[in-house]
């Protein structure tokens, strides 16, 4: 209940209600099942505007890795394109990370989403504070922070380092390349549901498509490129690499 009230207070329900957005939802059989839809409905979207998949309980997560990456969200991508939805939102199995599919059915890099959310928090929600990000997270966040004269702190790998900074109360946002987002007005930890809701809110408040928001963003900031490659390794291979 407390978590529900916090999330409800974090987004502009009036803007979302008036937007008439059509949203695709994929909890990947995980902890956000039911909650993503509930928050959208409580924010004013009509049930017929919300298209959801994988809300049933499946302890095998559809026999896929439920990490909200491009491979896991192929069905959400098809759903968005088929039904001509404005955006697709998803969470990983324990709902602490997010995944976003644009209106063209393309998966959007977490690095890009994190920078867009920061710009949204500052420009549309008028929030202030410092920003912290892990060492592997894109410096695109620095571009946004510097443009608004906000301090940026780089942390080692591991969200616990960001947690500690968020607990000081001096930081507006904590960001991690692996789709981890923390915002000062919420709990000082990753929250995938809130991250998804902030993207929907951003579109509603700006009254623009995601594609238009992204194009306008890159008129102001330089393009940054990043790519993540996951390699399956045996325990022996991991041990060998760690020794090096």
Question: Could you tell me what each predicted segment is?
Answer:
Residues 34-39, 62-66, 98-103, 141-147, ...:
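Short acidic, glycine/serine/threonine-rich loops at helix termini
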Residues 1-81:
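Gly/Ser/Thr-enriched, mixed-charge loops and adjacent short helices
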Residues 54-58, 112-115, 156-161, 179:
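Short, acidic/turn-prone active-site loops that include or flank metal/cofactor-
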Residues 87, 127-244:
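Phosphate-binding and adjacent anionic-ligand microenvironments
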């Amino acid at each position: 209940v407390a978590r529900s009230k916090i999330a409800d207070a974090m987004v502009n329900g009036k803007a979302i209600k008036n937007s008439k957005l059509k949203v695709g939802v994929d909890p990947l059989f995980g902890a956000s099942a039911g909650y993503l839809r509930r928050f959208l409905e409580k924010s004013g979207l009509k049930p017929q505007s919300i298209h959801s998949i994988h809300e049933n309980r499946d302890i095998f997560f559809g026999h896929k890795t439920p990490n909200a990456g491009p491979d896991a969200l192929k069905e959400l991508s098809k759903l968005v394109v088929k039904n001509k939805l404005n955006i697709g939102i998803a969470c990983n199995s324990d709902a602490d990370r997010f995944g976003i599919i644009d209106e063209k059915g393309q998966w959007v890099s977490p690095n890009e989403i994190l920078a867009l959310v920061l710009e949204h928090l500052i420009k549309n929600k008028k929030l202030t504070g410092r920003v912290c990000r892990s060492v592997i997270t894109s410096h695109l966040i620095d571009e946004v922070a510097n443009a608004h004269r906000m301090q940026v702190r780089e942390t080692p790998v591991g969200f616990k380092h960001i947690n500690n900074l968020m607990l000081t109360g001096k930081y507006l946002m904590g960001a991690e390349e692996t789709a981890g987002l923390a915002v000062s007005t919420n709990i000082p930890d990753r929250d995938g549901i809130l991250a998804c809701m902030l993207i929907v809110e951003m579109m509603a408040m700006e009254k623009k498509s995601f594609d238009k928001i992204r194009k306008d963003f890159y008129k102001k900031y330089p393009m940054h490129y990043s790519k993540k490659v996951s390699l399956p390794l045996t325990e022996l291979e991991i041990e060998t690499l760690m020794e090096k």
